[in-house]
Amino acid sequence: MGDNDIWHYILPFPFENEKRRLIWSVLQSKVGKTLLMNMNLDGRTYQRDLIKGTSYSNKSIIEYLKRMVSADILEQGMEQVTTGKRKVRIKWYVPTKLGRWFILFLKPTEEIPPDLVRKTIEEIFQVYASSIVEVCENFGIDIDLFRKILNKEYSNKTITET
């Protein structure tokens, strides 16, 4: 396998072991991946829509949604809706920033709008840039080393494309 034969996604994971374990359990499951793929990236996704839109049992769906909330992939809330004379409470979920990154990781690239790709790459780069600065400060590494690497890779890519 060559250096260019790698998956070009880098995803941050939480520090807490329990949250990482929950995320891995979601990503290793067909139920978890299906639910993530069916989440709205911007806006609420209602629990009832996930139950109607998949072939999995209510119990499995609710269990995986709870795992995702515990892992900080999703935030949840309740909404009261009036239908006729009845008031019904419905549960909704929205992806956190971390959740959006995992959803985008699972989606085919052609389904992701270019402006969302740009925004997401900026967010992830910001997280890694702040981590690199912290590591450089803690270990006495010159930050210019990383600037040079980025400039070299950009130059190599530009030369290759011309």
Label every model-predicted segment.
Residues 28, 37-41:
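Short, locally clustered residues in the helix-turn-helix/winged-helix DNA-binding domain
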Residues 43, 72, 78:
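Glycine-centered, phosphate/nucleic-acid-interacting loop/turn motifs that mediate DNA/RNA or nucleotide
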